[in-house]
Regions:
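Primarily recognizes the serine-hydrolase "nucleophile elbow" in alpha/beta-hydrolase
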Residues: 131-205, 223-224
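N-terminal cap/lid segment of alpha/beta-hydrolase-fold proteins
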Residues: 23-71
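C-terminal catalytic histidine-bearing segment of alpha/beta-hydrolase fold enzymes
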Residues: 65, 242, 252, 256-312
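Active-site glycine-rich loops that stabilize anionic/oxyanionic intermediates
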Residues: 81-86, 245
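Short beta-strand/loop motif that positions the catalytic acidic residue
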Residues: 241-243, 247
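Mobile cap/lid helix-loop segments that gate and shape the active-site cleft of serine hydrolases
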Residues: 46, 179, 188, 195-231, ...
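Catalytic nucleophile-loop/oxyanion-hole region of alpha/beta-hydrolase
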Residues: 89-91, 95-97, 110-147, 287-290
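Short beta-strand element of the alpha/beta-hydrolase
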Residues: 73-82
Length: 312
């Protein structure tokens, strides 16, 4: 009997060791992605569409953070960090916002999308954003969320991506073999922090996507296809936007351009411009006045019934 038990124990230890050795590095927090959640999943079970390889830089993921109490309030948020499409500000524009939302009863998801600096030019990051929204909606029952209470929030380049996802969604294909592809990628609410709306223009942008990634020869086509302010229509979800007057990286005019497009389309939205604050302020701890913007977001979420189970 002792020999049998010893054999079972050794087998279990071997299995455990094997699992430890075969952890997926793309979904496990490490030196370069320590902001990943304990539960992080690949957006596609195999290679992602347009993948150039199978390294982590080729693998979009979604980190999942549970609400601080019970099953939460039935709302979900997908966070899209900024980083100029060359990196991801996964802590102060990702994990910290996941914590902020889970404290309020949300299920939070942080998207790690593919970067243009790794050869993934638009629309590839948009494919990842759409898939993230579809994934959360398709699995709404698993997460105890309402599939019609999905918020997306993006900052800087992540704001450009979030605005694109909100203005250029795919409806879903009811006949698709993959259940995730059957549902719409349209978010229900949009939150933007100092968004790089003018990424594909040079009139007000201090940084040009086309120059940065050497695609000036097709910049006009990219501008027409991937400028969110040109894609706004009456079906665009209501938005909350904040920016600072002194942002030297992404001028406030870019948010104004998007907000004016929302007004023209009749989409009821809210915008706050603060006098002071640099680009990339996150939760706004650099200025006493700017620290208040999360409270304004809290009020906006509350007004839309997203902080209460069952809505308003």
């Amino acid at each position: 009997m002792r020999r049998i038990l010893a054999g079972i124990t050794m087998s279990l230890l071997a299995c455990t060791a094997g699992l430890a050795q075969h952890k997926d590095p793309c979904t496990t927090a490490g030196t370069n992605n320590d902001w990943l959640g304990i539960q992080t999943v690949r957006l596609w079970p195999g290679d992602a569409p347009e993948a150039k390889g199978n390294a982590c830089e080729d693998t979009p993921t979604l980190s999942i953070f549970s609400p601080h109490w019970g099953n939460g309030n039935g709302s979900a948020v997908i966070v899209m960090p900024g980083g100029g499409y060359v990196g991801l500000a996964g802590v102060h524009e990702g994990r910290e916002f996941a914590d902020w939302f889970t404290e309020r009863g949300f299920h939070a998801f942080v998207l790690s999308y593919r970067l243009s600096s790794n050869g993934y030019l638009l629309p590839v990051p948009l494919l990842d954003a759409r898939r993230a929204i579809q994934t959360v909606r398709a699995r709404a029952q698993d997460y105890h969320i309402d599939p019609n209470r999905i918020v997306i929030i993006g900052f800087s380049a992540g704001g450009h991506l979030a605005a694109l996802a909100a203005t250029d969604p795919v409806p879903g294909n009811p006949e698709a073999e993959d259940a995730i592809d059957r549902v719409s990628s349209r978010p229900d609410y949009l939150v933007l922090g100092y968004p790089w709306i003018g990424a594909l223009t040079t009139d007000t942008a201090h940084i040009s996507y086309c120059k940065q990634f050497n695609v000036m020869d097709r910049c006009e086509a990219l501008r027409l296809a991937y400028s969110p302010d040109l894609l706004v229509n009456k079906d665009t979800p209501p938005a909350f936007i904040f920016h600072t007057f002194t942002d030297q990286t992404v001028p406030v005019e870019q948010s104004l351009r998007f907000y004016n497009a929302l007004v023209k389309a009749g989409v009821k939205s809210e915008m706050h411009i603060f006098a002071n604050g640099p680009h990339g302020v996150g939760l706004g701890g650099v200025d006493p006045a700017l620290e208040q913007w999360p409270n304004l977001l809290d009020a906006w979420l509350r007004a839309h019934g997203l902080l209460s189970p069952g809505g308003p």
